[in-house]
């Protein structure tokens, strides 16, 4: 970067945003230079999305100031932010796919004469705009005929043509292949060289080191630090994101005696293009396999492919030794696979339904709605699991939304245990629950394992994984990159593998 490019264009001072019981942003100082690519990183709940929404007028900060080119600004909405010079392009392009490229580039500001659209002039200007960044395409074609990468490039060109001085790219590479990523990076570098400042939000660390000039890390709503990319080793970056220091302590514990050498579930070269790279995985009765990695590394996608939410398009799956085609969650459930998702409020519980109704849901779906479970049987089932798992609720008819996070998690576990699975996937089972419930869930996981259940546990709590997993698989950039056996298992070993 030149000396001029080191000039600050955007700055926040003490920016804070509060929601009931949550500090989404806490006194954040953020700085962006003219003509640089700034990577904005952080785990789930770090505050990245809140910061972006504050900068673009979606949220109004409760405290603090936003400065753009030395002037204090207060964006009222995204349109106002765009007028001020701050544009945003999201992973899901917010354009009109059935309209032409030219229409999308100039929608709302079409060239007109006497109230009539001057289409040829618009198409000429659109062609020239795309060509100015090295892209030759027929701007008369509908946007949806082009790749996702090209649609994003069109969205970026539109934002820049609207006089964006600062461009925020929120997970732009999440659904792109390698060639498409490089195409996007070429455009980002062109924009940087022309003096545009970019904020690049991503979870792909390799891409951060490919394209960014500096890195800002947020954690738990607070500013952790900003470093020059070329001066920040990846292991240091991971420490900043996770908030942990590497030490040499490794927990020594005996391995479990597996009930059988034959895997309950075995996946060979199993994957889905654009979702998760082909992977190999075997899980045996009475074994806990951990899945570790940063947010966006592919942990949840692995679970969704296994459970048939996003059916695989490559490889083979053997369930209890027999080849199976896992095309849906219902099919996976029938074959003895259960899945407790990470976001229990969105993907797990039915908030307004009772504890009883939430518990019997998976079993009823497995049986089919032509074989309804009687109300008496439902009541007996619910009472049994409330007793066995220690679910704290006034009654089986209490709406689950009024239960604590830990008790909601126990209800979800009850739902799947009722189907008598042989292989259970738990995605962040202890997230968002209090300390007491946290310990109870971990004890329950170990009890299920002792009873012969095969478990795949996704967790960001590395100490937890080290405490109960028999081995841990490391994910990075939607690929399996390492496996750590019990004898070598420690928090530093996991962190080093994540950052390698």
Swiss-Prot record:
Its main location: membrane. ATP binds at residues 42-49. It is an enzyme of class 7 (translocase). NCBIfam families: YtfR_transport (NF041861). GO terms for cellular component: ATP-binding cassette (ABC) transporter complex, substrate-binding subunit-containing. PROSITE patterns: ABC_TRANSPORTER_1, ABC_TRANSPORTER_2. Keywords: ATP-binding, Cell inner membrane, Cell membrane, Membrane, Nucleotide-binding, Repeat, Sugar transport, Translocase, Transport. Its EC number is 7.5.2.9. This is Galactofuranose transporter ATP-binding protein YtfR. The keyword Phosphoprotein does not apply. GO terms for molecular function: ABC-type D-galactofuranose transporter; ATP binding; ATP hydrolysis activity; ATPase-coupled transmembrane transporter activity. Residues 10-245, 259-497 form the ABC transporter domain. It is a peripheral membrane protein. It is found in: Cell inner membrane. The lineage of its organism: Bacteria, Pseudomonadati, Pseudomonadota, Gammaproteobacteria, Enterobacterales. The complex is composed of two ATP-binding proteins (YtfR), two transmembrane proteins (YtfT and YjfF) and a solute-binding protein (YtfQ). It catalyses: D-galactofuranose(out) + ATP + H2O = D-galactofuranose(in) + ADP + phosphate + H(+). Belongs to the ABC transporter superfamily.
């Amino acid at each position: 970067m030149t000396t001029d490019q080191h000039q600050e264009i955007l700055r926040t001072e003490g920016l804070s945003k509060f929601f009931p019981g949550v500090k989404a942003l806490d006194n954040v100082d953020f700085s962006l230079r003219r003509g640089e690519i700034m990577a904005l990183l952080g785990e789930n709940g770090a505050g990245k999305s809140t910061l972006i929404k504050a900068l673009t007028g979606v949220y109004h900060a409760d405290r603090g100031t936003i400065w753009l080119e030395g002037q204090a600004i207060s964006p009222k909405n995204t349109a106002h932010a765009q007028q001020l010079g701050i544009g945003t392009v999201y992973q899901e392009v917010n354009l009109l796919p059935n309209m032409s490229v030219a229409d999308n580039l100039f929608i709302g500001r079409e060239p007109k004469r006497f109230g009539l659209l001057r289409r040829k002039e618009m198409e000429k200007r659109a062609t020239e705009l795309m060509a100015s960044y090295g892209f030759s395409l027929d701007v008369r074609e509908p946007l949806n005929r082009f790749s996702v990468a090209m649609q994003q490039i069109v969205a970026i060109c539109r934002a820049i043509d609207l006089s964006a001085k600062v461009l925020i790219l929120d997970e732009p590479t999440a659904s792109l292949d390698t060639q498409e990523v490089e195409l996007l990076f070429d455009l980002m570098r062109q924009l940087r060289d022309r003096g545009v400042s970019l904020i690049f939000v991503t979870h792909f660390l390799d891409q951060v080191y490919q394209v960014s000039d500096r890195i800002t890390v947020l954690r738990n709503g607070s500013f952790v630090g900003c470093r020059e990319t070329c001066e920040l080793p990846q292991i240091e970056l991971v420490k900043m994101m996770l908030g942990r220091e590497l030490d040499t302590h490794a927990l020594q514990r005996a391995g479990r005696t597996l009930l059988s050498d034959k895997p309950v579930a075995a996946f060979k070269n199993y994957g889905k293009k654009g979702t998760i790279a082909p992977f190999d995985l075997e899980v045996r009765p009475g074994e806990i396999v951990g899945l570790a990695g940063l947010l966006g590394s592919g942990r949840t996608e692995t679970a969704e492919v296994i459970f048939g939410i996003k059916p695989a398009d490559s490889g083979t799956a053997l369930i209890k030794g027999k080849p199976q085609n896992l095309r849906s969650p219902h099919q996976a459930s029938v074959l003895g696979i259960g899945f407790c998702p990470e976001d229990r409020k969105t993907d797990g519980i039915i908030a307004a339904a009772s504890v009883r109704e939430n518990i019997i849901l998976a079993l009823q779906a497995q049986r089919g709605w032509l074989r309804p479970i009687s109300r008496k049987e439902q009541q007996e089932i619910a009472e049994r699991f409330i007793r066995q798992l220690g679910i704290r609720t006034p009654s089986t008819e209490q709406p689950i939304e009024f239960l604590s996070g830990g008790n909601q998690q126990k209800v979800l576990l009850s739902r799947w245990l009722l189907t008598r699975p042989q292989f259970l996937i738990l995605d962040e089972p202890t997230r968002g629950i209090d300390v007491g419930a946290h310990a109870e869930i971990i004890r329950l996981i170990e009890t299920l394992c002792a009873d012969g259940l095969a478990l795949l546990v996704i967790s960001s709590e590395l100490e937890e994984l080290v405490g109960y997993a028999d081995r841990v698989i490391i994910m990075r950039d939607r690929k399996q990159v390492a496996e750590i056996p019990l004898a070598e298992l420690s928090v530093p070993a996991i962190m080093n593998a994540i950052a390698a």
